[in-house]
Amino acid sequence: MTHAQIIASLIADNPRAKLAEVNLYAESFQQWQEATANIREHGAICAHPRTGQPIPNPYLTVQTAALKNLQRFARLRTDSLWRLDGEAQP
């Protein structure tokens, strides 16, 4: 199944609350990816824009918040909604 087919299946099989969860999961995953890429590029410590003093990269906070959202959905067992090659994941 393609990603689009999985989303279509989720929309058809789940009420609106589940659709909102799927959308939030996808958004959180995208935020986590972007934050991780920024941290890899600029490091965990960066310069303050006005003072130049070293500070923790603000994307660390974004990455942590997104990961917490992803973990929350793992507790809700949304992994059973996603399939690879038409097979349900255990």
Q: What residue spans do the PLM features occupy?
A:
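Positively charged, polar, low-complexity stretches
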Residues: 1-90
